[in-house]
Amino acid sequence: MIDDDGYRPNVGIVICNRQGQVMWARRYGQHSWQFPQGGINPGESPEQAMYRELFEEVGLSRKDVRILASTRNWLRYKLPKRLVRWDTKPVCIGQKQKWFLLQLVSNDSEINMQTSSTPEFDGWRWVSYWYPVRQVVSFKRDVYRRVMKEFASVVIAFQEAPPKPQSAPAWRRKRG
């Protein structure tokens, strides 16, 4: 599904841990790294596409994550001319993306890059929050910078929030 301007609707996913680090995934059989992302199918909402891509690419389900934020607007990047498939119609010149910031609430061991017969990634690691902006392929860099700027205050607040106090068991609470 390509829009009238030649952009493919897509979702991007930033997964953070409790320390404010983000998951950085290595493209299968390549030396390039990126955040999970993928196309939105006809009739699918961005949130539905995000959960589908989350499972397909990194093996996580709704129970493994919590949505912290999503971008206010669609963000676009153009593909370099050498990557545009000029022989397909309609021609896709880039991606327009809705991004989601997720907190991993399960253990790292739930991450599984092998849920598909054609995996997108073959490795991953936790990296500092701003690291991806400097390391992603150049044509995605502006979108990554905008995404990370928009999500930064949420991640900072999340990191600085004190842990929720555990309530005492009912038998230990004072009465009266």
Swiss-Prot record:
Listed CDD domains: NUDIX_Ap4A_hydrolase_plant_like (cd03671)
Function noted in UniProt: Accelerates the degradation of transcripts by removing pyrophosphate from the 5'-end of triphosphorylated RNA, leading to a more labile monophosphorylated state that can stimulate subsequent ribonuclease cleavage.
Cofactor or coenzyme needed: a divalent metal cation
Protein's name according to its UniProt entry: RNA pyrophosphohydrolase
Keyword Hydrolase on entry: yes
InterPro entries listed in its UniProt record: Nudix_hydrolase, NUDIX_hydrolase-like_dom_sf, NUDIX_hydrolase_CS, NUDIX_hydrolase_dom, RppH
Superkingdom, natural source: Bacteria
